[in-house]
Amino acid sequence: MQIIDGKKISQEIKDEVKEEVAQLKAEGKDIALAVIQVGADPASSVYVRNKKRACEYVGIESVSYELPEETTQEELMAIVDKCNKDPKINGILVQLPLPKHLDEDEVLLAIDPKKDVDGFHPVSVGNMVIGEKGFLPCTPAGVIQLLKRSGVEIDGKECVVVGRSNIVGKPMAMLLLRENGTVTVCHSHTKDLKEVCKRADILVVAIGKPKFIDDSYVKDGAVVIDVGIHINENNKLCGDVDYDKVAPKTSAITPVPGGVGPMTIAMLMKNCVESKKLFGE
């Protein structure tokens, strides 16, 4: 059984990005990412801090907008507009979730698709579906890299994605399809979830329920990717998969922490470089 090491693989990607950034800088091309955070949600603050640290490591400038909780929709839209128009900014990231009084969809739609390094804009999603160049959502793209760099063959394999969110489940299915996997998407209305999961050569779980998937959902020799992240009753991080029960049955599995998590930020850095290469002045 192989433990897929997301820390190691994400570091490889960041080192590759760092080299690309140095090369672009040598050609006089700087890269900058605008990070917009509204309010001081503790989890969001940790993510923002990690993104800034990654930017610093690879040589991308990060421009921070830390806005108070009571920021209005108009004020937020004005900052997005300012970043859209600033030729020095290559990527715009709005840290989600936003406070309840703000319209997330309107804000994400307002981001210039050429700067949509999160890959959430409908234009980016459309490009992903038809296989055009553009930004891929960071977490699902990170999962594909984990599989490929761990020597897991996707082509022709039975792939099951548990969860159909716009951020992970749906794009995950699309990216596995692009790699010629035979993909099934499961959700709360799926009948016989256990039986469907047991068909999977590659099982990707993003269901948002701690330790939901145990060994009865997994066939011998499957590859299991756990996208979930929760804090359990002992104040320890755990995923959607009951790791201790499932791991012995698998041929490869991602742990939580140290699996999918670190990949998301590494792929964000990769998207910032893509932005400069595809659309930079």
Q: Residues of each region from the PLM?
A:
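Rossmann-fold NAD(P)-binding glycine/threonine-rich loop
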Residues: 104-121, 125, 228-280
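Positively charged, low-complexity intrinsically disordered leader regions
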Residues: 1-29
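Short, well-structured alpha-helical segments in soluble
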Residues: 75-87
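Short beta-strand segments enriched in small/hydrophobic residues
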Residues: 31-39
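Anion-binding alpha/beta catalytic cores of soluble intermediary-metabolism enzymes, centered on
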Residues: 93-154
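Glycine-rich phosphate/diphosphate-binding loop of Rossmann-like nucleotide-binding domains
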Residues: 40-52, 134-223, 227, 236-247
